[in-house]
Amino acid sequence: MKIRLYGETMVVGNIIEGGKTVLNLTKEILEKEDENLKVSYPGTNYNLPIIYGLLGKKIETVKDLKELINSLEIKDEETLENALDAGVVTLICAEAIEALKYAKSEKPYKEPYVGFIPDEILRGLGVPLVEGKIPAILVVIGKVGDKEKLKKLIDDIKKRNILALLVGDIVKEMDEADIEYGLDKLLVPVGNEITSAIHAANLAIRAPLIFGGIEPGKTEEIIDYLKNRVPAVVVALGELDNITLAAGAGCIKAGVPVITNNEVPVIKGALESSDIDNIVENALKMKGVKVKVVEFDIPVSVGPMNEGERVRGPDMYVELAGPKSYGFELVKVVNKAEDKVEIIGKDIDEMEEGSRNPFAIIVEVSGSNLEEDLEGVLERRIHEFLNYIEGVMHLNQRDQVWIRINKNSFNKGLRLKHIGEVVKQLFKEHFPIVEKCNVIIITDPDKVKEELEKAKEIYKKRDEKTKSIREEDVDVFYGCVMCQSFAPTHVCIITPDRPSLCGSINYLDARAAAKIDPNGPIFEIPKGECLDEKLGIYTGVNEVVRERSQGSVEEMALHSALTNPCTSCGCFEAIVFYIPEVDGFGVAHRNFRGETPFGLPFSTLAGQCSGGKQVPGFVGISISYMKSPKFLQGDGGWERVVWLPKELKERVKDAIPEELYDKIATEEDVKTTDELIKFLKEKGHPIVKKTEEEVVEEVEEEKEEVKATEEEKEGIEVGELITKLAKEGGIQIIMKNVKIVINLNVKR
């Protein structure tokens, strides 16, 4: 039965009825199942997330589920508290029903629906969420019922670059309206049935576990985290049945507010009503999220929602630069730019369809606080800004640049002038220190060649300058607390030899960011006195970390995984983990889906140190740090690395000492620590020799100690020795002249 709701009492009653319906249905479903059937979701270390997160209970079989579900009850009295509790029961039951689907089928969801969203994807969303690039997550449930209103709703979501998790009839409506969706567009169809909404809820519930480091079962802490740190809102559209209302109540209880285009009793910040035309903006207000929407006077859309778009050969109108032509991109700081866009050569409509053409884009920027050292940092943003443009695909950088423009955008009227205007506007929008900006686009072949040679000289000078910078050459490091919105005690330290662990910020990036926004999340750290050069311990770093971590971290070693390692949030590209059986290290990257020699996947290992924790033996890192000359130097560097996934090993091949490359195992070489030990011995890894030498050294030291003790004891009468030991208490063993005396009754 579907109804519209106007009174608080009626809503409470509907929620309780909906919760009871779901609870009874779940009991009936479970009663028919084999108790020994294993239940879990693929790709997560937090099974089953809602139950594990809120209750701290690990569910492994149908029997476990039955025991839990049969212990649940919903009170009849129509109070708000009982309704919210009924909502939580509804979420738990939905989790049980959905988990059963995965127990019976490897892939219960067929396209276009995705169902359960793995940890890997959530971790991948971490950086854009903390940066604010993805400002919010909207769980959109139900049906719009009007094609034009649907288009406006989706447009409002897209131009704000919001991640939308779609449940119910809205997906079919989007199909009928020819609106594209997918993770690359941040419009994710989760499922058609209301129980599939649990996959949006269990995505949210994993945020405090993964990024916040909160222990499962600490319900109040998890709810507080969701309420104050996760920018998620449920948008319930169209007529709502009792079960949908109950699920919504569960979300409210868990700290995720609900907004609907129905008339409902308002609970400010928890349950609100809005007309559909303004529902996106009002949803953001419930979480205090402000998004500035920049308008562009061009014939196609512009924004982060277009990033990741691919232009395949059959869809391509023209290709600019790329492997079969030539070109470059360059940013130059000049004395006085004029805010102009200039095209030298043919525009797109003068090029032959399907052709490949030389291309250059030169961005000249001026401003009182700009300096030459910022050119490279600004230049890397060209890639991002061009990919903001609908129908434009930009790959690579510098003189390897490769651009394609698709037929649809060309037919809508997109031209080079528009591309130049977007780049100019975005540079000024994103970088307030850029006061004026010229964009010069060149397609004339001879002119591109001429300017290309000049650009190569500039690249060369930059690289020489950058390569020469080391930690010992600078007085200032940089800190980043961007991730504290998710991991409150995490402080990332960025040096010339250690990029941010998310991999997105190097030393020059951090320097530019601190200069552009002195009050922002990236800031200077005077490095102070070096206490240990090998480990990378500095007084200035310790002072800042102590203050910014709320006193939870006293000291931090920049280049060690064993001695006071750096804290980790949840966005790291890879994790270093200690393998005690071989006294060495393994490194697993985020995209590795297999198991390490421990028998554990990346997600499990990552859970050991994420959330801003400092855990000796585990540390999150960026992949680019593996190419640093100071990589784990406090622990022995590459000579202590014994295991890498094959894909990662290939990616960092140039950084691995040549004589070590074949001696480092991959998942194809070993599956267990026993196999790893055997592999390292066969290959003659330095760690084997080091371990053997240490054992010999320890034995020799023990021999010397025994000898010294015997020499010390010579001349001492046995009686004296016994008296002396007796004062110390305990069992006395005297091995002088092979005489053994044992006293079990010595009093202190």
From Swiss-Prot:
SUPFAM superfamilies: Prismane protein-like. [Ni-Fe-S] cluster binds at C480, C483, C569, C571. GO terms for molecular function: acetyltransferase activity; anaerobic carbon-monoxide dehydrogenase activity; CO-methylating acetyl-CoA synthase activity; iron ion binding; iron-sulfur cluster binding; nickel cation binding. Coiled coil: none annotated. InterPro entries: ACS_CODH_B_C (IPR045822), CO_DH/Ac-CoA_synth_bsu (IPR004461), CO_DH/Ac-CoA_synth_bsu_3_sf (IPR038571), CO_DH/Ac-CoA_synth_bsu_arc (IPR023432), CODH_A_N (IPR041350), Prismane-like_a/b-sand (IPR016099), Prismane-like_sf (IPR011254). It is an enzyme of class 2 (transferase). Pfam families: ACS_CODH_B_C (PF19436), CdhC (PF03598), CODH_A_N (PF18537). Its EC number is 2.3.1.169. Part of a complex that catalyzes the reversible cleavage of acetyl-CoA, allowing autotrophic growth from CO(2). The alpha-epsilon complex generates CO from CO(2), while the beta subunit (this protein) combines the CO with CoA and a methyl group to form acetyl-CoA. The methyl group, which is incorporated into acetyl-CoA, is transferred to the beta subunit by a corrinoid iron-sulfur protein (the gamma-delta complex). Belongs to the CdhC family. Monomer. The ACDS complex is made up of alpha, epsilon, beta, gamma and delta chains with a probable stoichiometry of (alpha(2)epsilon(2))(4)-beta(8)-(gamma(1)delta(1))(8) (Potential). This is Acetyl-CoA decarbonylase/synthase complex subunit beta 1. It comes from Methanocaldococcus jannaschii (strain ATCC 43067 / DSM 2661 / JAL-1 / JCM 10045 / NBRC 100440) (Methanococcus jannaschii).
